[in-house]
Amino acid sequence: MNKTLSLLTLLTILPLMLMAQEDNDKDWAPRKGNIKEVVVYGRRPMKEIGLQQTRFDSLALKENIALSMADVLTFNSSIFVKNYGRATLSTVAFRGTSPSHTQVTWNGMRINNPMLGMTDFSMIPSYFIDEASLLHGTSSVNEVGGGLGGSVKMSTHALKQEGFGLQYVQGIGSFKTFDEFLRLNYGNKHWQLSTRAVLSTSPNEYKYRNHDKKENIYDEDMNIVGQYYPIEYNHSGSFCDLHLLQEVYYDTRHGDRLGLNAWYLNSNRELQMLTTDYGNEMDFDNRQREQTFRGILSWEHTRSNWKLSTRAGYIHTWMAYDYMRDVGNGNMAHMTRSRSLVNTIYAQNEGEYHLAGKWMFTHSIAAHQHFVKSQDKNIIQQDGGKGIVGYNKARIELSGSASAKWRPNDRLGFSLVLREEMYGTEWSPVIPAFFMDGVISRTGNVIAKVSVSRNFRFPTLNDLYFLPGGNPDLRKERGWSYDTGLSFAISREDKYSLSGSATWFDSYINDWILWLPTNKGFFSPRNIKDVHAYGIELQGNLTAKFPKDWLLKVNGTYSWTPSINQGEPISQADQSIGKQLPYVPRHSSAITFHLSWRTWALLYKWCYYSERFTMSSNDITLTGKLPQYYMNNITIEKNFSFRWADLSLKGCINNLFNEEYLSVLSHPMPGINFEIFLGITPKWAKRDN
C-alpha cells in the first residue's frame, strides 16, 4: 500500500513540476547559444512515451557470422543468458524471472515454443536480424502480453539498394569449427529481394579441466601421495546448423508495402556429457534434432497521419530427442525416442492514428492457433492409441490491445494501454499499463519516466497436458510491475555524444508455476511461489570522434536483481522461502569497447555474472552454487577496398584469459579459442535507393 501511495503521489506531483518548468523555460531556445557544446535531441516519438527500451545497433548484430542472439544479449545487455556452450540451449532470465516470462517476437509474430513457453536464442543467428530491442518489464505490454520480465523484439527489413549485391563470409575457428554466410540481394525502386544462408558445423571437441573428478597420484609403492583434477575432452558436443532466410518486398511508392519473410532452420546437435559422467562417450548417443519453418506475409498501408498493417504467418516445428546406449557387442538400443510436432497459424492487424500532433491512438489484435503433438515412440500406446507419455492438443491464443498517447507539450507525455488475452477458453482480466515521461531539463535532455502495469502469463501446454505430470487445474501467473527512471543525452556536433539511463523496477508475481517431484515417481507443476523481483538497471553509451579519423564507441550495462521467493513453505523441509531464485545472478554487467581508425577496428567485450545458486535453498556446498565469472573477448579487423570488391579480414579471441567457468552445473565450457573470418563484397553496379 505504501508503494502504491508513493507512486500515486509521484504521478500527481511530477506533471505539475514539469508544467511549471515549461512556463519558466518558454524562452529556452534563445539561450541555446550559451551551451554550444550541447545539442538537444529532437522530439521524442509518441510511440515511445515512458518506455524502458534497449536497442542493439548494427555493430552488435553484425559483429561476426558465428554469433547467435544469445551472444548479442550476453555482451550488450544486463540479461543473464544461461547456456551450455556454443550451439546448445540458451535461455534468458530477464529481471529475475524465468525463461518463459520473456516473450519473443520476430516481425511481429510470437516465436516462443508453445510447449515450454521459452525461446532458444542459440537457434537465432544474429546475421539474420536487422533490428532488435528489449522492452523492459511494463514496457512489454505495448507489444505483447505474458512478458512478466520483458520482451525481445526482432525484425528483418529490406536493404533498399538498386541492382545486384552479394556478400560472402567464411569463418574458421578452434575445434575444427566452420562458419559460412552468403547473402544475395536485388533491388529497384519497387522490388527488394534478399536471400541469406548461414551454415555452422563443428565436432566441438574442446578440452577442459574437470573439477568434479579427482585422479590419484601414486608413488612407487602405490601409496597415494597427491591428487589432481584431470584434463578431459568434450567428445559429444558436435553440431550442424543450417539457416535459410528469403525476403521479398514490394513498395508501390504510393503508401502500400507488401512483404514476405520465410525462415527455415535445420539443426542436428549432440548433447554433451556431464562432468560427473564416468562413462565412455562411445557407449551412448545423445542427440537433438530440429526442423523449423517460419513464414510471414505482410501488408502495410501508410498515410500522413495514420497507418494500418496486416500480417499472416505459419510456423512448423519438428523436434526429436534420441538417447541410445550400447547394450553389448556394439549394439546400440534406443532408450528414448521423443518426437514433437508443432504447427502454428498466426494473424495480426495493427493500426496507428495521429490527431492534431498531440494525440496518438493504436490498436492491435493477434491470434495464434497452436496444434501440438508430443510422444515418446519407445512407449507402448494404451488402448485407443492414447500415449502414456506426451499429448495431442490444440489451443487458440488471442491478444488484443488499444492505447491512447497524449503529449500536451514538448515536455510531457502520457500513455494508457489496455490489453486483454484469451488462451483456450479462459480470458484474462483487463491488463492495464500506464506510462508517463517528462523533460526535467532541456540541458542534457534529462527525462524522467514512470510506468505501472498488471500482467498475466497462462500455463504452457506442457504445464497443462504433459503425460505424466501435467496439471490442468493450474492457475495463470499474475503480477504487478512498477518502473521509474531517469535518462539523459548530450552531444557536441562532430565531437562526441553521451547518453545514459538509470531505472528502478519492482515486480510482484503470484502463483508462480514450478515443477515439483511427486510420490508417484514423476514431476508435476504447481502454483506455489510468490516472487518479489526488484532492482536497478544502469546503461551508458559514449561515442567520441578524434582527429585523424579515430572513432571510439563504449557501451555499458549493469543490473542488480534480487529475485526472492516469498511464498508459503510447501513442506517442513522447504528452505526456499526468502531465498534468491536458482540461476538468477544478483549482479550482472557488460561492456563493449570499439575503437576504429580508417580501415582498422578493435573490439573488446567484457561481461560479468555474480554467483548463481543451483538450488532453491541457496545451499552453499560445491554443487549448490556456481562461482562468479568474467568473460573477455577481443576482435581485430582490417578492411580492404579494391575497384572490384571490398574485403575484410577479422580475427577473434574468445575467453581471452582462458577462464575456467561454468554457466550451468556440471557442463564444462571452452577455454581460450580463436576464429578467423574472411569476407568479400563484389562491387557490382548498385545505388542506394
Task: List each language-model region with its residue ranges.
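Gram-negative outer-membrane beta-barrel transporters
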Residues: 407-412, 503-508, 527-615, 646
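N-terminal periplasmic accessory domains that precede
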Residues: 37, 69-72, 90-93, 105, ...
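Membrane-embedded beta-barrel scaffold of Gram-negative outer-membrane proteins
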Residues: 303-323, 441, 449, 476-534, ...
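Short, acidic, small-residue-rich periplasmic hinge/interaction motif at the N-terminus
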Residues: 21-62, 99
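Periplasmic-side early beta-strands and strand-to-turn transitions of outer-membrane beta-barrels
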Residues: 186-286
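Extracytoplasmic beta-strand/coil segments of soluble accessory domains associated
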Residues: 70-110
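Face-selective signature of the C-terminal outer-membrane beta-barrel domain
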Residues: 249-267, 288-428, 435, 499-504, ...
